[in-house]
Amino acid sequence: MTREIVIGGVKIGAKRPLALVAGPCVIESELATMRQAERLMTICNALSLPLIFKASYDKANRTSIGAYRGPGMREGLRILRKVKESLGLAVLSDVHSIEQVAPAAEVLDVLQIPAFLCRQTDLLIAAAATGRVINVKKGQFLAPWDMKNVAAKIASSGNENIILTERGASFGYNNLVVDMRSFPVMRASGYPVIFDATHSVQLPGGQGESSGGQREFVEFLSRAAVAAGVDGIFMEVHEEPEKALCDGPNSIALNDLPALLATLKAIDAVVK
């Protein structure tokens, strides 16, 4: 059994019911972010599903130099603070450098370490020192059993509020695959495990100057992950994925979310 992590009013791990981390890939505007957060809250309240809202203020690892990155840290954190204070939702976003950690920790309930940065020791230790919950995405280049070393870096600072997220492994060029064995392997570390169902169907750089995606497989992979006993599901959602400024090809339309979440909740109830 994994330890229980408390994030605002949300409890993850230790056989707690499935939790959802969801929101747009990137903050596109204050109005759109608030609208989507409210919609997500309504959907999750109807299903009694715990929700943590996610959105990035800066996508620092976009495929091309001309791709939209977001509003920047200052404006992005202001918008996330508004989501948190207006709607009462816990909020999560990425930190990409040590300099971002302190200001981000003033607003965010969860500091997320991107997959490409999951072995950056100084960043992990700086994030851990804030005492915030740390969600680390497993690098596409790492074996699941290697994540125990990543978690140990964070725990060395006395912070064991750690969540590990599976987001697929590199499978040749421009492709990812999900190894379902990774869930029990990473949960054996004692920390809750989340499955990133939308980034796992990404085709990195698959469109030349942007990443492609196969959202039609999100439902199948997320059902399998919940059946395998994950503690939470991470999904990027959008009102109109075809118009999203980032990761549209692998984002889920908000209109399609209620039915999928109802199925996942039912599977989780059987497994747990």
Swiss-Prot record:
| Gene Ontology terms: biological process | keto-3-deoxy-D-manno-octulosonic acid biosynthetic process
Give the subcellular location.
Answer: Cytoplasm
| UniProt EC number | 2.5.1.55
The record's section on SUPFAM superfamilies has: Aldolase
Domain of life where this protein originates: Bacteria
Q: What class of enzyme is it?
A: transferase
Q: Which UniProt keywords apply?
A: Cytoplasm, Lipopolysaccharide biosynthesis, Transferase
- What does the record give as its pathway? Carbohydrate biosynthesis; 3-deoxy-D-manno-octulosonate biosynthesis; 3-deoxy-D-manno-octulosonate from D-ribulose 5-phosphate: step 2/3; Bacterial outer membrane biogenesis; lipopolysaccharide biosynthesis
Q: Name one GO cellular component term.
A: cytoplasm
The record's GO molecular-function terms, alphabetically, read: 3-deoxy-8-phosphooctulonate synthase activity
Q: What is the catalytic activity of this protein? A: D-arabinose 5-phosphate + phosphoenolpyruvate + H2O = 3-deoxy-alpha-D-manno-2-octulosonate-8-phosphate + phosphate
Q: In terms of one coarse class, where is the protein primarily found?
A: cytoplasm
Q: Which family does it belong to?
A: Belongs to the KdsA family.
> What HAMAP family is this protein classified in?
KDO8P_synth
How is this protein named in the record?
2-dehydro-3-deoxyphosphooctonate aldolase
Which species does the entry assign this protein to? Pelobacter propionicus (strain DSM 2379 / NBRC 103807 / OttBd1)
